[in-house]
Amino acid sequence: MSLLLEPSKEQIKEEKLYQQMGVSDDEFALIESILGRLPNYTEIGIFSVMWSEHCSYKNSKPILRKFPTSGERVLQGPGEGAGIVDIGDNQAVVFKIESHNHPSALEPYQGAATGVGGIIRDVFSMGARPIAVLNSLRFGELTSPRVKYLFEEVVAGIAGYGNCIGIPTVGGEVQFDSSYEGNPLVNAMCVGLINHEDIKKGQAKGVGNTVMYVGAKTGRDGIHGATFASEEMSDSSEEKRSAVQVGDPFMEKLLLEACLEVIQCDALVGIQDMGAAGLTSSSAEMASKAGSGIEMNLDLIPQRETGMTAYEMMLSESQERMLLVIERGREQEIIDIFDKYDLEAVSVGHVTDDKMLRLTHKGEVVCELPVDALAEEAPVYHKPSQEPAYYREFLETDVPAPQIEDANEMLKALLQQPTIASKEWVYDQYDYMVRTNTVVAPGSDAGVLRIRGTKKALAMTTDCNARYLYLDPEVGGKIAVAEAARNIICSGAEPLAVTDNLNFGNPEKPEIFWQIEKAADGISEACNVLSTPVIGGNVSLYNESNGTAIYPTPVIGMVGLIEDTAHITTQHFKQAGDLVYVIGETKPEFAGSELQKMTEGRIYGKAPQIDLDVELSRQKALLDAIKKGFVQSAHDVSEGGLGVAIAESVMTTENLGANVTVEGEAALLFSESQSRFVVSVKKEHQAAFEATVKDAVHIGEVTADGILAIQNQDGQQMIHAQTKELERVWKGAIPCLLKSKA
């Protein structure tokens, strides 16, 4: 494409060509006012990506301000590539979650793969070595051929990238619901480790310092990816396949090692990933954060395609690229390091003091824009908010307990629901043991990695039950944070902080904006009560397909610290004779449950309630008991209720069973009341455990007969099943659905 084909400034305005880039009439008028002139094609392209929701958070900034972002351990909150939390001994953990939803709907393999690559770069751009990847995935019903295709390709893309780069994929979640039929969610989280003195920022400081481009060459892939991520999916979205990037994990591995070596060199001033909006966002953001400007000569940009225009180079989202700022005169030191890895490192510009992004191409100035206008001064919209009509109706609807004729069959049926069923088919494709630090592999409440050279370990998880958020976004937001914390606690860790991925529909619809506001209120309250500040994250809006929105899905990524590896706990029962306890009472709460979805085919009613103070006291008591060595296993009660949680606890390599007595009718086994745990304890610790965890109720014991037996207080048998049979249906459900041609 040659420059001659680009429309003139006048054409852009008169024909409203800017609208095709997602810029509104009001925004164009504001741009004209800021510049005091009409923007050219490259400039309006740059504004369009920087002012997209994906880059500017223009619709969500008022919401994000609600989150608590500071704490005594927080070293870096929102605003950089990733958040950082102190874990003692001069070490810190770096983590962030990001979405790649729209690209994954079109090109599921590359969309998912580049989502993993992008979040890994965010973490190592802070100076940290990535140690783990997690993912949170949502798809439509697994009976649909298209959903099967998306599911298989997304998992293959995550595995293909993560396995090749040598970072273990240690956890995550997959849920299936019809609301994600046309718009799957692919959220990737990366966790890294760093020493305090190695922390780097994405800032272009020091007038005259050199701006260097490192990594892969620039192509035409991913142009307008950020804009594409800021609009609804529709039947015409297939035409935007070129907005999907293509990843090369082997290049990323080299880039990772080279960047970590460069970080040890004091010639490095600033470093940032070329993520969404590529060269545009990295240059404008680095300059704006430092109060400086950047001038670049685009003729010097390494290109893998011929005849690329300034517009294409600045908006490309080609992968595996970083922008560095280096002390002037020390460029060769950096070039030599990248040479070792057979990577390009090219000086393409310098830092200025005029707060402008100035670009030259073929001897002409093709862009001259104020960096603050691009990075910080995008318009912020306070969208109208309106409670949906269904909300009041749900709030006043108490869902009666379903009549269950055969609890045995109901348990088996629930264990085969794809959201509950074993995800072994997924994580068997991931290398979760590479680098040999993984202590708790996928399949328990949280992934756990040891920190070499110390007694410490890190627990990590992602969580969100979007059905609860659909019923009541504020309550659902609280539950999402609380469940993530429960998973961390069950692993023997103290929750440290949160990274959140806010996946919602179109914020221009008042009912959707209401969901976002209320969910943020719930998340904020839970983070305050549980002392887990939000240190960064991502907003993904416009998750709609042909006008239908996904369920509100604010995914919570959480990391916890295990002070001593002796405290590491998993969900599985350990030996016959151990006592089984449930912590927390079970109420008849079936709205939004897996049981309701399976038996009625729809979700309605009043969401399960949560008392955050009670939640906190139970979590603290359980963690105290774990640290004192009283607890053999711990598992949080979530989808499918107590029946499913106990069944999952008996599925071990040993042929264990459990004999349990509970109060109430069979349906209560599948209620999804909150703030509950299933715990096993050695008999000799019974008194000490009960004194520590006052809410714990002794309900039975672990047996050696391989049978799960559950009866009510009258001795009436509700469940009597071989644990190996339960495990067979649980593990076989997803492979069986994928093989069927339905």
Swiss-Prot record:
Residues noted as binding ATP in the record, renumbered to the chain: Y57, K96, G537
* A GO molecular-function annotation: magnesium ion binding
* UniProt record, GO biological process: 'de novo' IMP biosynthetic process; purine nucleotide biosynthetic process
- What cellular component terms from Gene Ontology apply here? cytoplasm
State which pathway it belongs to: Purine metabolism; IMP biosynthesis via de novo pathway; 5-amino-1-(5-phospho-D-ribosyl)imidazole from N(2)-formyl-N(1)-(5-phospho-D-ribosyl)glycinamide: step 1/2
For this protein, the Enzyme Commission number is: 6.3.5.3
Sorted alphabetically, the keyword list is: ATP-binding, Cytoplasm, Ligase, Magnesium, Metal-binding, Nucleotide-binding, Purine biosynthesis
Where substrate is bound, by residue?
S99, H100, N101, H102, R121, G225, Q245, E317, S318, Q319, S540
InterPro entries of this UniProt entry? PRibForGlyAmidine_synth_PurL (IPR010074), PurL_linker (IPR041609), PurM-like_C_dom (IPR010918), PurM-like_C_sf (IPR036676), PurM-like_N (IPR016188), PurM-like_N_sf (IPR036921)
Which Cys pairs are S-S linked? none
The reaction(s) annotated as catalysed by this protein in its Swiss-Prot or TrEMBL entry are: N(2)-formyl-N(1)-(5-phospho-beta-D-ribosyl)glycinamide + L-glutamine + ATP + H2O = 2-formamido-N(1)-(5-O-phospho-beta-D-ribosyl)acetamidine + L-glutamate + ADP + phosphate + H(+); L-glutamine + H2O = L-glutamate + NH4(+)
Fetch the CDD domains from UniProt.
PurL_repeat1, PurL_repeat2
Residues reported in the UniProt entry to bind Mg(2+) 2 = D122, D273
* Binding-site list for Mg(2+) 1: E98, N538
* Active site residues of this protein: H54, H100 (proton acceptor)
Q: Which Pfam families match?
A: AIRS (PF00586), AIRS_C (PF02769), FGAR-AT_linker (PF18072)
Location within or outside the cell: Cytoplasm
Query: What protein family does this chain belong to?
Result: Belongs to the FGAMS family.
The record's subunit annotation is: Monomer. Part of the FGAM synthase complex composed of 1 PurL, 1 PurQ and 2 PurS subunits.
General function of this protein: Part of the phosphoribosylformylglycinamidine synthase complex involved in the purines biosynthetic pathway. Catalyzes the ATP-dependent conversion of formylglycinamide ribonucleotide (FGAR) and glutamine to yield formylglycinamidine ribonucleotide (FGAM) and glutamate. The FGAM synthase complex is composed of three subunits. PurQ produces an ammonia molecule by converting glutamine to glutamate. PurL transfers the ammonia molecule to FGAR to form FGAM in an ATP-dependent manner.
Q: What is the protein named?
A: Phosphoribosylformylglycinamidine synthase subunit PurL
What organism is the protein native to?
Bacillus subtilis (strain 168)
